[in-house]
Amino acid sequence: MSLLKEFKEFAMRGNVIDLAVAVVMGVAFNKIVTALVDGIIMPCVGLLLGGINIAGLSFTVGDAQIKWGSFLQNVIDFIIVAFAIFVLIKLINLLQRKKENEPEPVTPEIQLLTEIRDLLARNSSKI
């Protein structure tokens, strides 16, 4: 089997495609969360702290500038993204559980077979 054919089979497997879609959606979701944090949450936090721009907070040690505010903002970004993904997964799991708990509709064939079984059981008990 050629290398190109093997790669094509690998790439067309469902889990690889699912992973690619998840990565693209994750990047898009990250942009949304970053906009939320940068545009809404951090300015509100800055207002609560007296109008301070948290991302710009830093201190200098010798010639090195330690940008701890930027680090703090990235930690907050991570926490919000992780929490949002957690909530999304919980919602998906809840919907899947609901779907699994729903009984399958009884087809006419199954209903007929059930009636035949019940009739046979009643007739055999009379013998």
UniProtKB/Swiss-Prot annotation:
The transmembrane segments are 9-29, 32-52, 75-95
Which cysteines are cross-linked by disulfides?
Answer: none
Q: Name one Pfam family in it.
A: MscL
Q: Which NCBIfam families match?
A: mscL (TIGR00220), PRK00567.1-4 (NF001843)
Q: What is this protein called?
A: Large-conductance mechanosensitive channel
Q: Where in the cell is it found?
A: Cell inner membrane
* Primary site of residence: membrane
Q: Which GO terms describe its cellular component?
A: plasma membrane
Q: What does this protein do?
A: Channel that opens in response to stretch forces in the membrane lipid bilayer. May participate in the regulation of osmotic pressure changes within the cell.
Annotated GO molecular function terms are: mechanosensitive monoatomic ion channel activity
Family assignment? Belongs to the MscL family.
Q: How does the annotation summarize its subunit structure?
A: Homopentamer.
- Specify the species: Legionella pneumophila (strain Paris)
**Which domain of life does this protein belong to?**
Bacteria
Keyword annotations for this protein? Cell inner membrane, Cell membrane, Ion channel, Ion transport, Membrane, Transmembrane, Transmembrane helix, Transport
Q: How does it sit in the membrane?
A: Multi-pass membrane protein
Note the InterPro entries from the entry: Mechanosensitive_channel_CS, MS_channel, MSC/AndL, MscL_channel
